[in-house]
Amino acid sequence: MFCKQKHKTRKKPAVNALMADLSDLSDDDLESLLENNVNRSVNQTVTRHRIPVQRDLFMNVLPNQQTFYEETHTDVSYGPTHHQLNEENLDEYIYPTNYEVRQYQYDIVRCALFENVLCAIPTGTGKTFIASTVMLNYYRWTKSSKIIFTAPTRPLVAQQIKACLGITGIPYSDTAILLDKSRKNREEIWQQKRVFFTTPQVVENDLKRGVLNPKDVVLLVIDEAHRARGNYAYVELTKFIDRFNTSYRLLALTATPAADLEGVQEVVNNLHISKIELRTEDSLDVARYMMRRDREMIEIGLIPEIEEVVEQIGIAIAPVLQEAIQLGIYESCEPHQINAFVAMQQSQKIILNPSIPEGLKWKNFFILQLLSQVGHMYRRLRIYGLRAFYNYFQNKYTEFTTKYSMKKSTNKTAANFFYSPILKTVIDKCKRRLEEPEFYSHEKLEYLNNELADFFTMAPSDSRAIIFTELRESALEIVKSIDILNDGALRPHIFIGQAKGKEHFDEETYIRKNKPKGRTKAARLRRIEEENRVEEEKKRQKEQAKLERTGRRTGSSEEAQLSGMNQKQQKKVISDFKKGIYNVLVCTSIGEEGLDIGEVDLIICFDSTSSPIKNIQRMGRTGRKRDGRIVLLFSGNEKFKFEQAMNDYENLQTAITHNALEYTKSDRILPPNVQPKCEEKFIIISNENDEVNKLEDSDEVIKYATQAMLGKLKTKKKEPKPKKTTAKAKKSSDKTFFMPDNVKEGFTSASSLLNKYTINEFGEKISLTPSVSKKAIKPKKEWNMLDEIEYDSVEISPAKSQVEQPSQPHKPTTTQGILTPDETTNHIPSASQGSSVQTDSHTVQEPVLKKLKLAHQIEDPSTSIEYYSGYELVPQYGATDSAQMLTMQEQRHFLKKYVPDTVHWSIAPDLAKSKTRKIRHVPKIEEILNTCQDMHTNTREKIIGMNRTNALARSIGYNRSVGMELEVMLPSIVVPNETITNAKNMTDLLEDEDGLSDFLSD
């Protein structure tokens, strides 16, 4: 029995928690810190449920069993938006009545104003009108926020420009079109305009360059939203904006969201959709506005020539298939059931399997490669006909036999197939049949021609027809078969993409490149001369063939099939199709979406696919403004695949309507207390905006709108061009890096992001407070043990004894060899007061020559003290301590002659900083610095011993005129390791003008 345990709530941290405790955060929580949750708060409630487990006889749970499972519930809430709202317009939203008010459009618009909506409605039912209405209202509701419409192609962008500007009346002065690759004035355009029509790639690039601030976006419209999968620009665009802005509206438009439920869920997740508005042609609120579409499905059998070829190929490939089945690399089937896609998948699995020996791996690969080629032959035979098969087979046959004859290939399996006598006989028959001018390589061609002839006989003169096929070879064959009818009423043309057609295997070129090359200069020259001659001959033949094609009616289609159609050629063909110069367009997949082809009355699908999206897009090209007809030609198992795909799509639509998807909650943007009411209003369009509705060509629409936005519609007098100057070009602005709110910029050390804990005696975790900066608590004291030491010899007077330093401590003076009281103890800290300085009141006796006695005797000098070092309280050794400081002889000598019992010389000067000056004599000072450097790598405290001949302590005077010699050991300085770690390096010290004095005193 399931038991519900007490649940716990976990709140995802906000951005301002970046400096908080990070030790207990999960990966998801850390990732959420990197996102800018501007006004979004996410709470996760985790509920644990017990699950039944197995127990032993003693009722103990058996090992390796899970005793519970967790159920996570996420609650998302939003705060006020960061956009500046126009309060006076929030009470209402405008619904244009310039066109007929349709209930489904009305409902979708109201929903899209307050939620992120995926609008999936049939082609031609007004998706652009819905987008324009939503754009209009957010233009009114906000003061300066950006509204962006994105589409993958220029024609789709042009359609939206016409719909938006021609319906909503948004002024040109606030709109911009960004389609070209030029980045000139792009930053100024983003700053000055509010409504943008562009492609997702342009927006993505400008966001990454820092030209567009993602926080300014309040509405993003995405057309053809079914592309928002994988790494497409739509996905990257929304990801980038979500990092900085969660308070924006997203409207996605498409006719088919995806082919399966997993694909729809991916689109929903990538675009953060909170609701799907789905309509079909059979929906009650849409059916009344749909034009009638008569759909006819025709099953066509195979001609005898095709059946014979299928049978003979099966006989030739049977031994190879049987071997593959025995090896276990292909499932058992009949030869005519070989599938190219299945064979290709199996070959990829074998290549990626490291456990198979290399020799066996490549043997199996070549077998499956041959089966895949045979699968392509079968598909071309059944769906496209004898000509498509013959061209493919002849290319593969020529390539293999050439390489095999030159011993560049040793594939005996493929050799047995291609050199099969039965196959050679069949190919010869195919060649003879294809040379007959009126021979139809597939029965589909005959049905297609009959359908076109009947349609244009009865249809009006302005009728148009489109034929869809996947292969370019098939498209050209269809154009030629229509041309053979010699019917003036049928004027076909091919319509394909920009890519060049695949070149067939050139036997002559391959042989010439792989034959033995002479090593002599003469042989090399002959080879180069021969290559040039062959290239010139090929060039001449191509020019001759092109000249011959221009004399035929299908010449332009043949040329397009070889070299592809660039955008200029595509535009011209579409323009001629709209004008009626061509009334039959034979398209590949390029004509399925993204092009404004115009009104079409007849659609013929020469082949079909297993993708419902492609099938729906093809059929959606007709029946937009008037009734249309759809003819589907099937052969082989095409009908089964088509019906299965459409049934799966219907099941998908049912699953979507029954809430089988997980949605993301979106920000309402408007305040909760604002409930705008609908105002149906007829919008008066300005003459400039209305002019765009009269344009048909997409490029003309874009050109006109661009000129209007730039204010160049009215003719102006041409101003004389300014003379060229040598002035430097204006420097481009620096790239802007947009950051989420409340983010600490700059570099942060890793130690500052960590919290340290300690465990007390009770086992409790106690947080340690962060260490205080040394610089912050460092007392500003001066320990000037050595003042103005510039010379390392006591026999030479300092050359710079008169340096004026206002902050310089009191210097010791002597009068006939007698030290004054303050000279001796002013700088010495008292043992009773730690680091504070106290002046001793005892008198000082006149020192005897060669022996300088200091008569100060109170308290036991061995008493140890603690003094504040600037960072922490550390114990210091007394004068009599022998913990690796001074030898016994040095201690006795030091205490006897120089140190009174009240004085403690364990002074650790702060070496954290020193002034930058210059030392003229460095030999002895370098020796001291080497000692400091040795201390840096040691864990203990060491003694820096300094001989009296190298430096004078402040407490000891020196009278050069007396000429006395001091044979004493100067006091040693105890320097803790902590104070040395931040000391200046030797190079800085050697450049110190005032020498070691400031190094020890600062």
From Swiss-Prot:
Q: How does it assemble?
A: Interacts with the MHF histone-fold complex to form the FANCM-MHF complex.
Q: Which GO terms describe its molecular function?
A: 3'-5' DNA helicase activity; ATP binding; ATP hydrolysis activity; four-way junction DNA binding; four-way junction helicase activity
Disulfide bonds, paired cysteine numbers: none
Instruction: Tell me which residues make up the Helicase ATP-binding domain.
Output: 108-275
* Helicase C-terminal domain mapped to chain residues: 506-669
The UniProt regions of compositional bias labelled Polar residues, in chain numbering, are: 553-568
Q: Where is this motif: DEAH box?
A: 223-226
- Keyword annotations for this protein? ATP-binding, DNA damage, DNA repair, DNA-binding, Helicase, Hydrolase, Nucleotide-binding, Nucleus
This molecule's function is given as: ATP-dependent DNA helicase involved in DNA damage repair by homologous recombination and in genome maintenance. Capable of unwinding D-loops. Plays a role in limiting crossover recombinants during mitotic DNA double-strand break (DSB) repair. Component of a FANCM-MHF complex which promotes gene conversion at blocked replication forks, probably by reversal of the stalled fork.
The reaction(s) this protein catalyses? ATP + H2O = ADP + phosphate + H(+)
A cellular component annotation (GO) from this entry: nucleus
A Pfam family annotated for this chain is DEAD
This protein's species is: Kluyveromyces lactis (strain ATCC 8585 / CBS 2359 / DSM 70799 / NBRC 1267 / NRRL Y-1140 / WM37) (Yeast)
Q: Report residue spans for region: Disordered.
A: 531-569, 799-843
| The protein, known as | ATP-dependent DNA helicase MPH1
Record's compositionally biased regions (Basic and acidic residues): 531-551
EC numbers for this chain: 3.6.4.12
Can you tell me which residues bind ATP?
121-128
* GO terms (BP aspect): double-strand break repair via synthesis-dependent strand annealing; interstrand cross-link repair
Cite the PANTHER family for this sequence. FANCONI ANEMIA GROUP M FANCM FAMILY MEMBER, FANCONI ANEMIA GROUP M PROTEIN
Q: Which family does it belong to?
A: Belongs to the DEAD box helicase family. DEAH subfamily. FANCM sub-subfamily.
Q: According to its UniProt record, where is this protein located? A: Nucleus
